[in-house]
Amino acid sequence: MKELAQFRICFPGQWVKDVVIPATNKEINGDPLTLSEFYIYLGCHFFMACFEGISDQRLWWSSKPVSMRDGASFRLNEFISLRRYNDITSAIRYTDKPPPDFVDRFHDVRQMIDAFNQHYAEEYIPSWLNCLDESMNSWLDKFCPGFMSFPRKPHPLGNEYHSIADGDDGKPVMWRIKLQEGKDRPKDATGKWAFPSKFEGTNAASGRKFSKTATLMCEMTEPIHGTGKIVSMDSGFCVTAGILHLHELGVYGQALIKKRKYWPKDVPGDQIDRYFDGKEL
């Protein structure tokens, strides 16, 4: 299978056809955007993202010869003109839904994220072992919605996504994402959180409450509920209630325990201490 064919299998193409192209064509100058032209435009974006230190995007369309000392390392004129590229960039839309009657700073991308998750939930079967973690989407404008700073990350500034991927065979495929909205999470006209999760409040079957972390764990693993598959997490997800909620939903969760003075609540720390007592580590 060629790279483009494999990419299109993994990409929510139906959403592009039904939403992106029609919504963009309502705004674009010149000829309507076609599906093939959209993939050319997207490919140019991906190609430019592979190179660092090119401060001016227009250099990719420069008429000057390629130089070892300055400018871009390639020219994109044979694929798309700079004017057409800018026209598409100005007109590109990722939703065809009207804005809600409350302030939602994520409205323009919410449908895109839902389309990605739905595509993988319907078309992809994750392996038996999966990894849930955080990912940073680098963004240098601190006024972007949901802007966060994590100094310990390689790219510390931008949007934080929680993401889950296959952990088997060393070939990870990310199959579900959730944008962390932080202080920009919207509320509806009644003052309640908009877009509530089905995993909030109390589990009717067990009577166990959902914490914020437990809610996130259940949301991110929803496509594999009832499968008996495993999700591995770092210490940020080491919440006993969350692990138990996953177990009740048919998913086995394991998380690194970051032990300080005391063991986490409900963990049989004394038994663990006795088991390792005298053993060589």
Which residues does each PLM region occupy?
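N-terminal initiation segments
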Residues: 1-252, 256-261
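An anionic, glycine-rich sequence signature occurring as long contiguous blocks
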Residues: 263-281
